[in-house]
Amino acid sequence: ALLNICLSRLSTNPLILFLFFGITSVLINAFCFKKYVKYFMISMLFYLVHTYVARELMQIRAGLACALCLFSLRYIVNKCPWRFLITIILASSFHLGAVVFLIAYPLGQYKFNSKKVAIAIICALIISSIFPLGAFFKSLPSYAFLNRIQYYNDTEYGQSSGLFTNVVIIKELLIIIVCLAYRRVLENIPYFNVSFNTYVVSLIWLILWNDFSIVASRIATFYSIGEVLLMAMLPFITKSGGSRNILAVLLILLAGVIMFMNIYTGKWDGVVII
């Protein structure tokens, strides 16, 4: 991407570039959490115990691009298409994959009912079972514009991530089911609709491309940016007072479980948070 080339001209030290991408991503995310949700610390906690490790430390360019996509949600909610477009162009200058987030603008303007969401997910499951898109893609002849993706065919990134054996798909499906069950309460929260709609797209994409993990994860990463926002909105499904505080504590404990799972699986090996 263009800005990556410009930054590399300023310094050849990879540590400086890493610090720039990492610090900028964290600051943008923290700013957005503070503006978008009431339970800021819940979003921040889930971000640090998982997203920060799985994305910012492993895909630093995608991490910054995702942070800018998260920032662009305000322009979807406030219906500022040109500002949204400029923000996505900026994100694309760091990681070209951010271009796919352009579809988020029209998605954010609609309120899909629970029935349509359920039908879309069921259709995705059926399609992935009878017509695996990854297998079809891998069978295509070698074209120049496909070379970059087809390179992963014979690597671990081209393998199937599974459907109901895929922890990410199960997690996203459970979050969506909870959101649908309490939608009447949650839909009154300003950023719920756009976060939920894009999150549904993330799940559908993961299901459709489950047999080609690199394609599934690269695109779903951008559409799952609202996950930490949705987690911070869940306390509102209970009545204010003790019940809401108890649910907030349970979410904090869940974040702790996720952190220990990441440590156990080795994702945190050598990671030191200062």
Regions found by a protein language model. Name each.
Residues 10-24:
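Loop-to-helix entry region of an early transmembrane alpha helix in multi-pass inner-membrane enzymes
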Residues 1-12:
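Short hydrophobic/aromatic helix or loop-helix immediately within or flanking a transmembrane segment
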Residues 105, 109-219, 262-273:
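Alpha-helical transmembrane segments and terminal signal-anchor/GPI-anchor hydrophobic tails
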Residues 122, 239-260:
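Signature aromatic-anchored transmembrane alpha helix within multi-pass, membrane-resident enzymes
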Residues 69-82:
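Membrane-interface transmembrane helices that cradle and orient dolichyl/undecaprenyl
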Residues 57-63:
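Short acidic/glycine- and proline-prone juxtamembrane loop motifs at membrane-interface regions
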Residues 52, 83-107:
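Membrane-interface alpha helices of multi-pass inner-membrane proteins
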Residues 30-49:
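Transmembrane-helix signature of polytopic, membrane-embedded enzymes
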